[in-house]
């Protein structure tokens, strides 16, 4: 794909985008946009307005060129006067002449409301907030399509990157037996000390004998990763964001997880084709075409998967794949499968291509056929008494006492499990025992 001809400044006008959320993702998008001739970001909405001002300054735009506005009228005037506008309510900038909303707030209800309003005002939506996309992405996509607009995930985050890699493989006629991403966590093994460090969890643990599990050898792959897991039980092997992102991928591609909490093996990059294939061929999956994640197992001197994405494909043309294997592509021990992967995700640094594709080509880089196939639900991990408030917080937007699980999507009803991010800040109206999925009937919900 030659991007410079697709997005040629000599034949296209600049795209004007607004941004909601100025955290790590939003700030990186804002910075990178300054180097893109076809992209301008003259408005940012965030709950903490100083964060947006700081993001503009970090991107090379002085505070003197930024106006914090407290009403729609103030925002319109500041915009007309050539200032970059910062607000704490999306309604204040919804009527500005903008082409695209990049939604990266991570706040599910506010995010959904902003996206819906943007669509009503004629903007395309690049949805970065997976918390929102996993719950109402298909609804927002339909609303956008009805108005001739684009709703899409954004390149730079794993869902869009994996959706793109899957679609690339399908266009080329590859039989994809597995797909997924590396988790939030690297497990870094130091063979000299027999220690495993997980920087993401700020833990280092002794693992005597791990050296014997460094390679599969002639042993079954499932046996080896099972022994690794047993040595690393004090570390978390999956997170709610991992599950949420794969729900988004499932709804865009039709591929489903093999089990509600994934297999999530601790695995080296070159082990992917032995693991993410059917059990009949020595892998983990009950059936082909499944989604999963893995925790990248590596030495300190080896490169990380960096939260990247992968597909595992069938090696139908044995002769060609022997050539490719010799060039270094990871293949399974039985030579039936190969892993193709993209070891990076660059946050907002690469989201600009999704913005330009939506505005200039009406193309959704994250796929145009979103369906409610998979729900991220919440399950109590301990007894939760009536009156418990399901507060959501932290970097990973977790709920204390509740874990995420992936289930086939179901209509919302009194006894149906609710999507995880609809539980946020709700109060239990009855006791919920450990192991139970939390349903609508368990919550004290407002009548509206």
Where do the language-model regions lie?
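Short catalytic-loop micro-motif centered on adjacent basic/acidic residues
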Residues: 43, 102-103, 125-128, 151-154
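N-terminal glycine-/serine-/threonine-rich beta1-alpha1-beta2 phosphate-ribose binding loop
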Residues: 1-117
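Short, ordered loop/turn segments at secondary-structure junctions
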Residues: 47, 106, 130-133, 156-157, ...
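Rossmann-fold NAD(P)-binding glycine/threonine-rich loop
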Residues: 109-121, 129-157, 162, 167-168
